Design a protein with these regions (language model features):
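An N-terminal boundary/leader segment
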Residues: 1-48, 274-276, 451-452
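Acyltransferase
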Residues: 18-23, 52, 259-284, 314-320, ...
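Glycine-rich, small-residue loops and helix-cap segments
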Residues: 25, 69, 75, 109, ...
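Flexible, glycine/charged-enriched surface loops at secondary-structure junctions
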Residues: 38, 224-231, 274-287
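Acidic/His- and Gly-rich active-site-bordering loop/insert found
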Residues: 47, 57-128
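Short helix-loop capping/hinge segments that flank enzyme active sites or metal/cofactor-binding pockets
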Residues: 67-87, 240-245, 301-353, 411-421
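Short glycine/serine-rich loop segments
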Residues: 99-218, 403, 408-416, 420-423
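A short helix-breaking turn/cap at a secondary-structure junction
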Residues: 182-266, 447-452
Length: 452
């Protein structure tokens, strides 16, 4: 993958430049895009102009931020002033909104080079786009953040950003070998996308420092979602620190795992124990057992909450005659719900969050897999637990609970299963995002990646 912060000093020294760095990204795109299909649109003219302006600032010794000159990809559900925002749907083909959403505006102010819009599933839900996995063209990149994950994994860009409601960021990052963060709920401003109560804006990158740098610039310049305190922590990510105690979560995803992935994860846990990390399992503490029980059914719970909250929008989209059958099924399920059904779902989510808080005295964080294994093949159908539809971009069973809980999590590319990347997911209590980067950094420096 292609990193940024570790070459930035060469911009200041004059031995490299943002424009030259951008051109290297474009060479990779020219080589790999015909197969990977990560991009909806590229704005090369504006990107080159932005890179040249960044170069002038470096020559003057006055970069706007540590990410000044960084080429970035924006998921095509986020509005951009200079490119269409199509939301993965023919309904909005060629739609120009003539404005930047909050995160795009923030990254431009930080000197980021917005290279293009990356592929998303339809309205960031279940119908896949054309993107393939950069490690295997016959495998899914995951979804809904397909293009962002694939572009980073292919080395086209050092970082990109997207949103997640169920598992649409962490899971594709796992499949494509990215580092990625889903911050605490509300920590980064979602801009116009505020209609879903568990929508998280997050970042994918080729390194942990690049990941945190982009997240920090969004937080510092755009702030949080309204009513939330925002992302805590300084500009530089936390120094490596050993997590002395970690709670091991199985979640409902464990039963979906293949044996190689289970064995590799268990081997990684043994490596942690050998380094002095105390691991706490559900059999060790009643509060962990209670928590594991409370988060069962999170996949269906997330579908219930999200489809109900999207009901009014899906009605409008259906009226165009261009809504996919996949989302018509989601709308049909939502139309069967009452307000009381929604209230009961929210109550269950609140109970899950209370159970999470009860774990705080036990450990610094939690650990599990980021996906039930490596990326499945394109077209593979995953049982959703509901007969009406199947998931088409992989199984979100390790991600739904973390989204419903609103906790921060980071995925690390520490496993290789059948020569394909698979992530490990580190999680913490609300607003421990910065500390979590220190735990993640220690793990990357200390643990040997495991192949199976």
């Amino acid at each position: 993958m292609r990193t940024f912060l570790d070459v930035r000093d060469s911009f200041l020294e004059g031995s490299d430049s943002p424009r030259d760095y951008l051109e290297r990204c474009l060479e990779c795109i020219d080589s790999r895009e015909p197969q990977v299909k990560a991009w909806v649109v590229l704005n090369l003219e504006n990107a080159r102009q932005a890179a040249d302006e960044s170069g002038k600032r470096y020559r003057q010794g006055k970069p706007l931020s540590v990410i000044d000159g960084m080429p970035l990809g924006s998921k095509d559900v986020l509005q951009t002033l200079d490119m269409p925002t199509e939301l993965g749907s023919p309904i909005f083909k060629g739609r120009e909104t003539n404005m930047d959403t909050a995160s795009v505006n923030a990254l431009r102010l930080a000197g980021g080079v917005i290279l293009g819009k990356t592929v998303t599933t339809e309205f960031a839900f279940v119908k896949p786009g054309p993107t393939t996995n950069p490690f295997d063209p016959q495998a899914t990149p995951g979804g809904s953040s397909s293009g962002t994950s694939a572009a980073v994994g292919a080395g086209m860009i050092p970082a990109g950003w997207r949103n997640q409601v169920v598992g649409s960021g962490i899971r594709p990052a796992s499949y494509c070998g990215n580092f990625a963060i889903k911050p605490t709920i509300g920590a980064l401003h979602n801009g116009e996308g505020l209609s879903l109560s568990q929508l998280h804006l997050g970042v994918h990158a080729a390194s942990l420092p690049d990941m945190w740098a982009v997240a920090y610039q969004i937080a510092n310049r755009a702030g949080s979602d309204p009513g939330y305190p925002g992302l805590y922590g300084p500009e530089k990510m936390c120094d490596p620190q050993i997590p002395r105690r970690l709670i091991v979560l199985k979640t409902e995803g464990w039963d979906d795992c293949d044996e190689k992935t289970k064995d590799a994860f268990l081997e990684l846990l043994e490596s942690l124990k050998a380094q002095g990390v105390k691991l706490i399992h559900r059999s060790d503490d009643k509060s962990v057992e209670h928590f594991e029980t409370s988060i069962l059914g999170s996949v269906i719970l997330c579908r219930i909450i999200c489809s109900y909250e999207m009901r009014w929008l899906l009605r409008n989209y259906k009226a165009t005659g261009l809504l996919s059958e996949d989302l018509k099924q989601w709308l049909d399920l939502a139309e069967e719900m009452s307000l009381q059904d929604y209230r009961e779902a929210l109550q269950k989510r609140d109970e899950m969050r209370k159970a999470l808080q009860a774990l705080s005295p036990l450990a610094e964080g939690l650990i599990t897999l980021s996906s039930p294994g490596p990326a499945p093949s394109l077209g593979h159908l995953v049982d959703s637990g509901e007969p009406e539809f199947a998931y088409k971009t992989g199984n979100p069973s390790f991600n739904a609970a973390t989204s419903a809980l609103g906790l921060p999590c980071i995925t690390l590319p520490l496993l290789g299963i059948d020569r394909m990347p698979t992530g490990i997911q580190l999680m913490g209590q609300h607003h421990t995002d910065w500390n979590l980067t220190g735990d993640a950094s220690w793990m990357m420096q200390t643990l040997k990646p495991i192949s199976a």
